Every structure is written in structure tokens, then in C-alpha cells.
Amino acid sequence: MPLLTPTSVVLGVLLSQFLNGYEWAVPWIFAFITFAGSLSANFQSLRHALSHPLPMILALFVLHIFMPLFAWGSGHLIFKGDPLTITGLTLAVVIPTGITSLIWAAMYKGNVGLTLSIILVDTVLSPLIVPLSLSLLAGAQVHMDVWGMMKGLIVMVVIPSFLGMLFNQMSSPERTAFVSSALSPFSKLCLMAVIAINSSAIAPYFKSIDLRFAGIAVTVFFIALTGYAAAWLIGKMMKRRQEEIVSLIFTGGMRNISAGAVLAVTFFPSQVAVPVVIGMLFQQILAALFGYMLNRFELKPMLQKA
């Protein structure tokens, strides 16, 4: 994953003249990706998390209160007078948590049920939270098609997630595992296609990299890093169990950034998409970095105590 995203961005920029015009297909391709990623979820995990809500509330606080305000404030501090860049920075963090956070949480002994539940609840709420957050933080400065964004999120994220969960619920574990493994390679290829098409839409910005572009990249990296760190700190402050902290780190730090890029390209001027696409470059790299830090500072001490 850390190599897949930058490779797709580079291909999108280099092949922009061939990929431009295919933006219409992206929401449907992304709906397939969401369906494939949701096959591991079911309604029981959601019910369990709702009966023990504190870890989920902490994750949603990081995702939709702390990080949007932090990104919005950072944008106004660093890019004052540039509402499109500020909106892009904000959009990159108001979108729901990423499905791939489940992979990272499982890899580092996180609470898989909690991670799934955070993904599901955040996904279901996203058609309301994303437009509302952007309207409150950037609505006065940038024209937005709020209803269009809500419909886009419902088609790309909510309906495919529900269908994936329904398939899991109504099928045997063996059949679900078979379908999930069969769709996995196609899902990765589709993700590459989505990233490449979205990157092609902002190719001119990547082809003329200057100090301003570098400043946006550094800011995006710092904001993304803060999401992981804030989730870790809040988990420790609230004295959560180790597996819950791992889940909080990856759900709080990762975003469904490809969905954010689709929204940026579809509903905003291309400049808004620049911070979002840059965020795609850093997300998996930062996940790997925090996985290493977890092994060093969180998981090893627990193993030594045992």
C-alpha cells in the first residue's frame, strides 16, 4: 500500500491527457471498492460497539471535531486569503475514516470489532457530517453543492457498505472469505484507477511544483501526522486498553482519502483537490511509521510485562 498510492499518482500525472474525461466513472468504481472492503463487516460488530460507545466516541471526536478544527485553523494560519487551499485541507480530514485502517489495526493487534464499528458508523454518518462540516468551516468562502456531495457519499460509501455487510450476514463465512479474496486484486486495481484519474485532474499543479506547492505538502504531512498522534495521546489519557489504542490510532489517523479526492474533483475547483491528493501520498507511509512506533513503544513493553 505505501507504494501503490504514489505509483498511481505518478501514472495519473504522466497519463493525464488520456485519463481526463473519465471522472464520471470514478464514483461507480469507488462503490465497488467500498463493497469489496465491507465484506468483512457485519451487523453484530456494530451492535457490540454501540453497547460500549466510549472508544467510538473518542474516535469520532478525533475524526470530526479535533482534526477538522485543527486543519481549518492551520490553513488560515499558513494560507490566509486562499480559501480553496483551506477548503482542501479541511476536506482531507472531514471525510470518514478509511477502510484500510482495518488492515493496519489487525496487523498490529488492534480491536478488529471496534475498528469495523468505527468504520461503519462513520460511513453511515458521512453524508451528513461531511457537507455540514464543510458548510460550517468553509461555506461562506467557497460555493458547494451540498446535496450533490450527500448523494455522492450515499452512492460511493453508504449503499455499497450496507450491501457488503448484508452479504456477510446472509452468507457462510467460507463463501464470504472466497468472494472477498476473489475481489481483492480487482479492488486494488480499481483503487489505482481511481487515484490515477483523480490525479490527472490536477496534473498541472504537479507539473509546476514550486515553493507554494511544497508548503502545501509539508502542511498536509504535519496535519496527517497530528491525526495519528492525537488519537494515540487521547487513547492513553483515557486509559484505554492496548488493542483499543491501536484501533484509535489507525481509525483516527487514516481517512477514506480516495473518496475525498472524488468529492474534491467533482464538486470543487481543481485547486481544492491538491491537498487531498497530496494526502493520499502520505497516508499509508504514516500508517507504516506509526505501526513501527507501536511495535517499539506500545506492543513490546506489553510483551515484556507478560
Curated annotation (Swiss-Prot):
Q: One Pfam match, by short name?
A: SBF
Q: Write out the entry's keywords from A to Z.
A: Cell membrane, Membrane, Transmembrane, Transmembrane helix
Q: Which Gene3D superfamilies match?
A: 1.20.1530.20
Q: Where are the transmembrane segments?
A: 13-33, 53-73, 86-106, 112-132, 147-167, 177-197, 214-234, 246-268, 272-294
Q: Which domain of life is it from?
A: Bacteria
Instruction: Note the InterPro entries from the entry.
Output: BilAc:Na_symport/Acr3, Bilac:Na_transpt, Na+/solute_symporter_sf
What GO cellular component entries does it have?
A: plasma membrane
The UniProt entry lists the main location of this chain as membrane
Membrane topology category: Multi-pass membrane protein
Presence of the UniProt keyword Ion transport in the record: no
The record lists the organism as Bacillus subtilis (strain 168)
Entry's localization field: Cell membrane
Q: Please give the name of this protein.
A: Uncharacterized protein YbaS
Question: Does the UniProt entry include the keyword NAD?
Answer: no
